[in-house]
């Protein structure tokens, strides 16, 4: 562990000054690794005491997630569980998605995403995507500035109509572009 300390300290020093640390890092799904942070990383990023002391591998995390995934009684509950994981730890989410694509594809996208769209108001956890309505006419440029990332490589758009043959889902159709981007 002590040999990791200089590397982690250097890596932390090379990061931008505004890089999240402490609880901000743990609540950032792009960078959070939960108990996967090494002891040296915990020291460098101000995580000491914020996590259980044992460091667990990505494989251990993935096995635990899959164990809980299979305990969910319905595909919609599996969908909500996986989206919750994506909200906490994107690296682990995509690792599980890639390693278990045949199992995850029908959960993250069709057919389960259709049911997720129909239940969107009941399973909504946090905003995903950018909602633009007719009321935003004339202010779309300002609205686009609210997106938190500058590095945008792909955009998926829907008007919420005819979602998977389910009819007009309106804002509840956001599950379709989010699901497409996940895959």
Predicted features along the sequence, with ranges:
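Metallocofactor- and cofactor-centric catalytic cores in central/energy metabolism, strongly enriched
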Residues: 3-183
């Amino acid at each position: 562990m002590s040999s990791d300390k200089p590397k982690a300290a250097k890596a932390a020093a090379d990061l931008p000054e505004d890089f999240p640390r402490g609880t901000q890092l743990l609540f950032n799904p792009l960078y959070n690794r939960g108990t996967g942070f090494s002891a040296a990383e915990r020291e460098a990023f101000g995580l000491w005491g914020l996590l259980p002391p044992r460091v667990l591998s990505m494989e251990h995390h993935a096995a635990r997630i899959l164990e809980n995934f299979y305990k969910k009684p319905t595909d919609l509950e599996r969908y909500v569980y996986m989206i919750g994981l994506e909200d906490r730890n994107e690296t682990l989410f995509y690792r599980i998605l890639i390693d278990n694509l045949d199992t995850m594809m029908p959960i993250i996208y069709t057919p389960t995403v259709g049911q997720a769209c129909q239940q969107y108001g009941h399973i909504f956890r946090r905003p995903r995507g950018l909602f633009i309505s007719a009321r935003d006419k004339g202010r779309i440029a300002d609205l686009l500035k609210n997106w938190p990332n500058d590095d945008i490589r792909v955009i998926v758009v829907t008007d919420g109509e005819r979602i998977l043959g389910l009819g007009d889902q309106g804002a509840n159709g956001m599950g379709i572009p989010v699901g497409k981007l996940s895959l």
